[in-house]
Amino acid sequence: MEFAFACRESLNPSYMVCVSAEGKAARACLMKENRILSEVWLYNLDSAPEAGETDETYNKNAAEFVAEKKFVIPKSKDQIAVRWFRLNGAVLASIYIDEVLHATLISNELIGRCRLAKKNGPLAKVLKLLV
């Protein structure tokens, strides 16, 4: 299922998260005034390659970086929600898929964090949940 959408922060509409699931992978970008501040890989749209693909616009994350977690690819954008926070002066966008925290983007970190990341890589960092 391919889709793309944007969600603006209500208190400061100059910030926006764009989510796209097109081509080979899904990703999200935190933007301010059309400038990317942070981006993160969300999931591959099919199996992970052994070596990372680096020449495509929407890169698939390589198997070495993808955790072996059960994950159902969303069928529509309605399954994805963005929640906004402030963290030590930075803007934090939390991305939920089916009401489960899936990824975070912080305005002062170029690469975001994703729960499907097994180890830090060029497309996503590990999302550590504090419970």
Predicted regions and their residues:
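Surface-exposed loop/turn elements that mediate protein-protein interactions on large endomembrane-trafficking
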Residues: 1-3, 28-75, 102-127
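Exposed beta-strand and adjacent loop surfaces of beta-rich binding modules
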Residues: 25
